[in-house]
């Protein structure tokens, strides 16, 4: 058997790392194809070194662009590699343009597609990620669903049950494995001590197009952050995405954020550093699906700055509240989460998902 693992972003590298580690213990022929979907080295390449992962066999250097431009370039370049390598299975993870392009090329070439994190649904077709994940699921031969909720989403859409495997989420494997590394790493500890001034800080991330490309919505979120500071007197560490920084400047919101003494804006950091920031935060504010999961696993209360989530399990267990861009909801949610006991059950599995996936791809069963 021969596997092509196609990835292109930081979350994909993180969530596929447990599968890669499991593959390294086998005799399976496999390789990594990296589309380089993110244009910043800080945003993805650094993770291979941090996670002790082998370098990609292929770097496609696609970079940023419109959805059509980026996906089109990927289709062309991925096809060249798959025609050369002729794998039996292509493995993709998540909901990016890399995932859709990899799955489409493989499907056209009659190569089986294995979709890790299948069945997630926000039920919002305005999100590009929703289109990517739905299309990918419907052309996949192996659908690795993280939870029963995800499996039921797939069954409702008519996908055959014998293609669906509930394996848990590889984010649990990655979080548990790499937090230990982070806590022992002197450079990570030094970074943490240099950034964190107040022990009871909130951590903020913001990058979704529906938030940062909408001036009114972004303005509402920023104003909500200022109100939280005013009411709760908390320090906020804002790990800022390049796209978000660009929009904040464009909408004349950046200088106001930067001048607030309670807000510490930091450039994108390595995965291990970010894990430490998450683990030690009093509260996390985010629009990232992966961060919602990590917060839940790490037992840190989370508030999601979106109207919906494809991680409803985090809401069901009480680890997460959705507030969208509504300031009143945000302020109320902060009060609720600051008083919440961190005793919810992790709904994403026991950290063995990577091994399960490799067993299924190898033997066709758990």
From Swiss-Prot:
4Fe-4S recorded as keyword: no
Major subcellular location class: cytoplasm
UniProt keyword list: Cytoplasm, Isomerase
MF (Gene Ontology): UDP-N-acetylglucosamine 2-epimerase activity
Places the protein is found: Cytoplasm
Pfam families xrefs: Epimerase_2
Cytoplasm found in the keyword field: yes
Single GO cellular component term: cytoplasm
Active site, renumbered: 207
Reaction(s) catalysed (UniProt annotation): UDP-N-acetyl-alpha-D-glucosamine = UDP-N-acetyl-alpha-D-mannosamine
Enzyme Commission identifier(s): 5.1.3.14
Entry-linked InterPro entries: UDP_GlcNAc_Epimerase_2_dom, WecB-like
SUPFAM superfamilies on file: UDP-Glycosyltransferase/glycogen phosphorylase
Assembly and interaction partners: Homodimer.
NCBIfam families for the chain: wecB
Family: Belongs to the UDP-N-acetylglucosamine 2-epimerase family.
Name of the molecule in the record: UDP-N-acetylglucosamine 2-epimerase
Organism whose genome encodes this protein: Methanocaldococcus jannaschii (strain ATCC 43067 / DSM 2661 / JAL-1 / JCM 10045 / NBRC 100440)
